[in-house]
Curated annotation (Swiss-Prot):
GO BP: arginine catabolic process to glutamate; arginine catabolic process to succinate
Active-site annotation: E174, H248, C365
Pathway where it operates: Amino-acid degradation; L-arginine degradation via AST pathway; L-glutamate and succinate from L-arginine: step 2/5
Organism: Escherichia coli O7:K1 (strain IAI39 / ExPEC)
SUPFAM superfamilies: Pentein
Lineage: Bacteria, Pseudomonadati, Pseudomonadota, Gammaproteobacteria, Enterobacterales
Family: Belongs to the succinylarginine dihydrolase family.
EC class of the enzyme, as a word: hydrolase
Protein name in UniProt: N-succinylarginine dihydrolase
Keywords: Arginine metabolism, Hydrolase
Encoding gene, per UniProt annotation: astB
Length: 447
């Protein structure tokens, strides 16, 4: 059956700031306390969406979450009106304010793990929300992510959205950032590659930085998504590269159809994994980048592998990269050699995503890949699909509500909270989502 990959990109939120919340993510740590530009960040992301949509790649948008997220501050013991809660936490425990104001939901590669209908036992598209258990600021995302996905994929005959796994370290799940799908045409059954960093009873794990994904979580997600057991491979990421800042697999590998583009040191027991993929995926091609050409450090600093590998109708592929790759002589030299070599990659497309990159999120972090048949695509909430009208409406919306400069100190401003709620109220109507945010269901949450 014919099917297409639709990229659902996260829209950067109004409180995008640099707080260094993500230990193990070196860009996040390096840019801590710098001032950010939320308006520019949102526009950089929108421009990528629109460019790819104009180039013929189906594209949609996932909206930001409510931030600062007052209900969690109340759970932490701060009371009074919303304004009083903000004032108290800013004075007594400002680190909590930064955590509950994070715009990290923009990296929707971590929102969920997807199983296309061609891979599932019941013939539905399955989406399992990620619990993002390893980082407090990200663990807050799952309930609203679930509401948003149910509002976008609202046809229960075709889509099944599963709640996140229990919030315990044993079941740490980071979503599609640790998941690849390999195969022929999108509509054909594919091989799902789940990548984990640690498993109970296995001493092979990183020592410097945390392994965020567990094998136990990956296995549970595969079960929830009803993936045909014959179409699943579980593989461990190389713990040494996690310790060098590769906190998700999509920082060291990206797949599309029959191609796996990865670093030579991406996986533990890499040669066995590639042999298994060759045996199970028709026409499988591994493009392994040697450490002598690109070091792991350079891969992390440029986000070479946090790229999007997109298929054109003629079978050729385009690699979507952050500007940092073009600015690194060694990486750019390698990429031009890659273009000249015998493989499907025939074009490089570069985007300026500096605002997201400074927090450790490149092109692949910003998108959730969902393979859909034509019938399934028609069943998606049409208001989220990118086109000229939506692009212009979202740009105007960003101009109206977003600040062009934000520091951690600004997060205590009650006006920022009010601006954010008003903006999301308007956005949820624009995207026909209904009342997906807690403040909409609780009448503002004051008290």
């Amino acid at each position: 059956m014919n099917a297409w990959e639709v990229n659902f990109d996260g829209l950067v939120g109004l409180t995008h700031h640099y707080a260094g919340l993500s230990f193990g993510n070196e860009a996040s740590t390096r840019h801590r306390f710098q001032s950010s530009n939320p308006r520019l960040a949102a526009k950089q992301g929108l421009l990528k969406m629109k460019n790819l949509a104009d180039a013929g790649f189906p594209q949609a948008v996932i909206p930001p979450h409510e931030r600062p997220f007052i209900p969690v501050l109340r759970q932490l013991g701060f009371s009074g009106s919303d304004e009083h809660v903000l004032e108290k936490v800013a004075r007594q425990a400002p680190h909590w304010l930064s955590s509950v104001s994070s715009a990290s939901p923009m990296w929707v590669a971590n929102a969920a793990t997807i199983a296309p209908s061609a891979d599932t036992l019941d013939g539905k598209v399955h989406l399992t929300v990620a619990n993002l258990n390893n980082k407090f600021h990200r663990s807050l995302e799952a309930p609203v992510t679930e509401s948003l996905l149910k509002a976008i994929f609202d046809d229960e005959e075709k889509f099944s959205v599963h709640s996140a796994l229990p919030q315990v370290a044993l079941l740490g799940d980071e979503g599609a950032a640790n998941h690849n799908r390999l195969g022929g045409h999108y509509g054909e059954p594919g091989m799902q590659l789940f990548v984990y960093g640690r498993e109970e009873g296995n001493d092979t794990r990183p020592s410097r930085y945390p392994a965020r994904q567990t094998r136990e979580a990956s296995e549970a997600v595969a079960r929830l998504n009803q993936v045909n057991p014959q179409q699943v491979i579980f593989a461990q990421q190389n713990p040494d590269v996690i310790d060098q800042g590769v906190f998700h697999n999509d920082v060291i590998a990206v797949s599309n159809r029959q191609v796996l583009f990865c670093h030579q040191q991406a996986f533990a027991r890499q040669s066995q994994l590639l042999a298994s993929l060759r045996a199970r995926v028709n026409g499988f091609m591994a493009i392994e980048v040697p450490a002598t050409h690109v070091s792991v450090s350079d891969a992390v600093s440029t986000y070479l592998f946090n790229s999007q590998l997109l298929s054109r109708d003629d079978g050729s592929m385009m690699l979507v990269l952050p500007q940092e790759c073009r600015e690194h002589a060694g990486v750019w030299g390698y990429l031009n050699e890659l273009l000249a070599a015998d493989n499907p990659i025939s074009e490089l497309k570069v985007f300026d995503l500096r605002e997201s990159m400074a927090n450790g999120g490149g092109p692949a972090c910003l998108r959730l890949r969902v393979v859909l048949t034509e019938e399934e695509r028609r069943a998606v909430n049409p208001a989220v699909m990118m086109n000229d009208t939506l692009f212009n409406a979202l740009n105007d919306w960003v101009d109206r509500y977003y600040r062009d400069r934000l520091t951690a100190a600004d997060l205590a401003d009650p006006q920022l909270l009010r601006e954010g709620r008003e903006a999301l109220d308007v956005l949820s109507q624009l995207l026909n989502l209904g009342s997906v945010y807690p403040f909409q269901r609780e009448g503002g949450g004051n008290g």
